A protein has these predicted regions:
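Glycine-/small-residue-enriched capping loops at alpha/beta junctions
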Residues: 1-155
Length: 155
């Protein structure tokens, strides 16, 4: 059995914190939250460029990896589609956490940061949203490896 075994709450200072991966949730309307707009400025408009293209539509479960470029301490950015803003629920925040965990696991990234997915669309407390996202991270990273003969190390 293998899974993500540690989730910590931490503020992210994009200008100084070094992360292998930062995960942001994007709705189908592609409207960035205030925090995401700040991230976009640090990334020199790279998030807006990706959203202007039609490849990433923000559909639930859709993902897009972005390499932000030189001079930015975050190595990779993962956009996670959240679906329609008006239909977003706390369970979909949990699902987005699972999607982020699986994508990080595929790339063997042990440490990564996620935002509170869909915080602007939910009436829940920050604690409830954080719990749902953390549950999604843990459940999404779960792998049953008991009977596998070729066990890969799991992030």
């Amino acid at each position: 059995m293998a899974f993500l075994d540690q989730v910590e709450q931490a503020g992210v200072d994009i200008a100084t914190d070094k992360w292998n991966l930062l995960c942001l949730g994007i709705f189908e309307d592609k409207e960035l939250s205030n925090q995401q707009q700040q991230f976009d400025k640090v990334f020199s408009g790279r998030i807006s460029e990706i959203l202007a293209e039609d490849d990433f539509r923000g559909e639930s479960g859709q993902t897009e990896f972005v390499h932000p470029g030189q001079g930015i301490p975050v190595k990779r950015l993962l956009l996670v589609g959240l679906g329609k803003r008006e239909k977003f629920t706390i369970d979909k925040a949990r699902h987005a956490g699972g999607t982020a965990a699986r994508e990080a696991q595929k790339r063997r990234l042990a440490e990564f940061a996620v935002e509170l997915f869909g915080k602007t669309a939910l009436n829940e407390s920050t604690g409830e949203i954080g719990q749902a996202v953390a549950e999604g991270l843990v459940l999404g990273s779960y792998q049953f490896t008991e009977y596998k003969t070729d066990r890969k190390s799991v992030v």
